[in-house]
Amino acid sequence: MLYLEDYLEMIEQLPMDLRDRFTEMREMDLQVQNAMDQLEQRVNEFFMNAKKNKPEWREEQMTSIKKDYYKALEDADEKVQLANQIYDLVDRHLRKLDQELAKFKMELEADNAGITEILERRSLELDTPSQPVNNHHAHSHTPVEKRKHNPSSHHGATDHVPEKKFKSEALLSTLTSDASKENTPGRRNNNSSSSSNNAYNTNSSQPLASYNLGSLSSGSGAGAITMAAAQAVQATAQMKEGRRTSSLKASYEAFKNNDFQLGREFSLSRDSTGYSSSALASTLTQTLSSSSTDSRSGRKSKNNNKSSSQQSSSSSSSSSLSSCSSSSALAQELSQQTAVIPESDSNSQVDWTYDPNEPRYCICNQVSYGEMVGCDNQDCPIEWFHYGCVGLTEAPKGKWYCPQCTAAMKRRGSRHK
């Protein structure tokens, strides 16, 4: 799991490279602007003195002005080329980041199926600001903005700590404590239940956040996986919201399209917690659907009876999760109220999806990746093509036209004959 360290090492020089190129671009921009101002002044002087001088002088001045204009145009083109190089540099690093994220998610899924969904859902929950609960009816009319800047005195000293940071620290402390107590199976139930309750009692409106990653696997590598998950949550919590949610949207789209289902691959230690995979899958499905902003009315279902039973089992599981205070009571309630959910195929894998708003290119209608070649036909509807899709292994010499434009040019040539 060295993807993060490798990527950070790769982009270590990126800020300095961008700064140097932006500085160079700014210098070229000023150079072009100064040249245009001088040329404008020379043109005005030329027209003012044109009638007083000989035709030879006018021709000489006109040639000199045109030459300087072409020089300014070349500088402007060079500035545009530099901007394109900067864009390609950043885009290449973004694609590399997407690839490393996909590898990291697959490595986590190989050890614990479904762990990335829980981590990403918790990250979104940390991003979502929750309104502070005010128990006094006398202050119920106070606006939310005012309560944020003027906290009540009855909340104590913890009001000075941001809620998002507090919940992140509580989550990380729970994960690390579960990982350290993995080797004591006799006290696993008590430790997991007590740490879970202590960590998430601060937010009673989210009872489903009290899952224990320490109980995800009972194998010898469970402690390492839990520690890796804790580090992943910590790194994700420290990222900016824009960059963090970009990769999460793809996972939620895959989950909503039934490309990914939690089944028996979600290996829980049944000897310690007694959770059933179907109960946890139904609970996660209900939680994900309730947090999504998309409407359920537009979704198509193949079997209405199965979907209704799943929704009822999810609601009952959610109510039991919020009412139980210990893991043993939670396991007993879930075992009595859950229904059977169709399990996903064990060989199914999560397909890495790109941003749906990213433009598509080439005859394969896919996003930009790898080496691409541009069609020299200005009216080409596709414009950019992958090397492999058009049978290229290196950059073509001279002008290059795509197969569609080549066929169209041949048809036009045959008509003229």
UniProtKB/Swiss-Prot annotation:
Subunit structure: Interacts with H3K4me3 and to a lesser extent with H3K4me2. Component of the NuA4 histone acetyltransferase complex.
Site (Histone H3K4me3 binding): Y361, M372, D376, W384
GO molecular function, one term: zinc ion binding
GO annotation terms (biological process): chromatin remodeling
Compartment(s) of residence: Nucleus
Name of the protein in question: Inhibitor of growth protein 3
Signal sequence extent: none
Domain free text: The PHD-type zinc finger mediates the binding to H3K4me3.
Low complexity compositional bias, start-end: 189-203, 286-295, 307-320
Bias (Basic residues) ranges: 136-152
Function description: Component of the NuA4 histone acetyltransferase (HAT) complex which is involved in transcriptional activation of select genes principally by acetylation of nucleosomal histone H4 and H2A. This modification may both alter nucleosome - DNA interactions and promote interaction of the modified histones with other proteins which positively regulate transcription. NuA4 may also play a direct role in DNA repair when directly recruited to sites of DNA damage.
Gene3D superfamilies the record matches: 6.10.140.1740, Zinc/RING finger domain, C3HC4 (zinc finger)
Stretches of the chain forming a coiled coil according to its record: none
Main location: nucleus
